[in-house]
Each structure stands twice: as structure tokens, then as C-alpha cells.
A protein has these predicted regions:
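A conserved active-site cap/scaffold subdomain adjacent to cofactor or substrate pockets
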Residues: 122-142
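Mid-to-C-terminal alpha-helical segments outside catalytic/metal-binding sites
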Residues: 201-248
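Non-cysteine beta-strand/loop elements that form the S-adenosyl-L-methionine
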Residues: 33-40, 123-130, 164-170
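Single conserved hydrophobic/aromatic residue that forms the stacking wall/gate
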Residues: 1-8, 12
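Active-site beta-loop-alpha junctions enriched in small/polar residues
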Residues: 13-14, 40-42, 73, 78-85, ...
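Short acidic/histidine-rich active-site segments
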Residues: 159-184, 188-193, 197-209
């Protein structure tokens, strides 16, 4: 039976550490094991994927990566720009992760990742968690299970199977005010829609085949349909993440 991945504690933005590197150890003590260097915008650590100019990892970011490596916190570049992500791969002494994103060959968005970047990530021992958030899916809420699983099969040709997992980005029973806060925070007086639109400003509906964690059974069946065996499916649905974190 394929192994289903469990949840891990992740700091979504770097705000909890403000500009104090000593707070990284504090959030580790509270259970954090993954931390993103950015959300969509520029942070004190690196550039987000929505910035016009990607300045790469900053001096503070370099020191933060060293401290995260020391403690055993995974460097997560899901929302970061491409140059910043390459920098993080180069600077980190341990493999990094893109915990929730999809390849741009399947669905082109600012949050999607290029083949070249994903090849570099896999060669460094890093992990990609495939997102099930509708804005990251081809055809959004109407994305088919077949399309998703066919993408996974093609991605194996790019990255190899050991570096691919699931990072569902699933937000259940949350009000739209949560995603509005995530996009706007306190940095703008204008309304920032992020990956949304005027007609779809809140959380989008999940596809029918992944309404909640029970949808992993559908993914298991879909992966079998496109040719994966039980060992491969176990790897993608959990074992790859388990093996990855053992190196951190």
C-alpha cells in the first residue's frame, strides 16, 4: 500500500524572524522544520516570484540559510524568484525544497518552475512537492486527474522519480479573508489579487478528485493508470519526502 505523506510545520513567510537571525532557532524550538525565504514579494532574505527584478538571496538570506542548515530547517523556495532559487541551491549545504509548485511545461504561471531549474534542483538532491491548489493546475478547478498524472509521468523524465512528492497546498474550511491577508499583509493599501482575479478573489474550489486528503486514493489510482508501479507510487506519495528529510 502506498505511503501517504504527513504534515510538517512550515513557516509560510519569513516575518516571524523579522530581522533577527536568533529567532530562527526559536521557531525551530517551536517545531518549525521548513521555512520559506519569501512569499510572492521581496523580503529581507530573497526576491519573490512576483517581483519584476529578482536580486537573488540577500546578505541576511545567506546567513539565514547557514543557520537553517545548522538547525535542520529546510530552505523552501516555493514562492521565490528563479535567480533567488538558484542562489539558495548554490548556497545551502543541504538539499533545499520547493514544497508546493508545478512545472511550467504543464501550466505557465509566475509560481511555476522551469525545466532547467527543476533539473538543477534534482541534481542537488532537492525536492519538488507538486501542488494541488487550483491556481497551480492546468485548467484550474476543472483540471482532470488524467492530466495531473500525465504531468507527473513527464516530470520524471526531467527530474527523476526520487525528487518528486506531493505538496498539496490544501486549505480546508478557511475564510477568504485568510488568503486576502496572505496577499496583502500590511505592505499595500491597494487590493492585491495575487494568483486570483476580480471574478475569483478568494479560495478557488478544489477539483472533484482532490477535495480533501481522501483524494490521495484518487491520485494513487491515477498514477497506476499512467504506468507507475506500487514502489514508485509509494515514493511519490510519501517515501521521497521521508528520505529527503533524513538528509536534513
Amino acid at each position: 500500500t502506498p505511503v501517504i505523506s504527513s504534515a510538517a510545520s512550515d513557516v509560510y513567510k519569513r516575518q516571524p524572524i523579522e530581522d533577527d537571525i536568533n529567532l530562527i532557532e526559536k521557531i525551530y524550538e517551536y517545531g518549525c522544520r521548513f521555512m520559506q525565504l519569501t512569499y510572492n514579494n521581496q523580503s529581507l532574505l530573497a526576491s519573490g516570484c512576483y517581483e519584476k527584478n529578482d536580486g537573488g538571496v540577500t546578505n541576511f538570506g545567506r546567513e539565514a540559510i547557514k543557520e537553517m542548515n545548522r538547525l535542520g530547517i529546510v530552505v523552501d523556495m516555493s514562492h521565490s524568484g528563479e535567480k533567488s532559487t538558484y542562489d539558495a541551491i548554490d548556497l545551502s549545504q543541504k538539499p533545499i525544497a520547493i514544497t508546493h509548485a508545478n512545472p511550467s511545461f504543464w501550466h505557465q504561471t509566475r509560481r511555476s518552475k522551469s525545466d532547467d531549474l527543476l533539473k538543477t534542483l534534482s541534481k542537488s538532491g532537492g525536492m519538488l512537492g507538486l501542488s494541488l491548489y487550483p491556481h497551480h493546475l492546468k485548467d484550474g478547478t476543472n483540471c482532470s486527474l488524467d492530466s495531473f498524472c500525465e504531468m507527473v509521468a513527464r516530470l520524471v523524465d526531467v527530474m527523476g522519480i526520487k525528487n518528486i512528492g506531493i505538496g498539496s497546498d490544501l486549505c480546508l474550511n478557511q475564510p477568504d479573508s485568510v488568503v486576502e491577508w496572505m496577499r496583502n499583509g500590511t505592505w499595500t493599501k491597494s487590493k492585491n489579487l495575487g494568483e486570483g482575479s476580480k471574478t475569483n478573489q478568494g479560495f478557488p474550489d478544489q477539483p472533484e478528485w482532490f477535495k480533501d486528503a481522501r483524494g490521495f486514493n484518487n491520485i494513487e489510482n491515477g498514477l497506476k493508470k499512467v504506468g507507475f508501479d506500487n514502489n514508485d507510487i509509494s515514493a511519490i506519495l510519501g517515501n521521497n519526502w521521508f528520505n529527503f528529510y533524513k538528509e536534513i
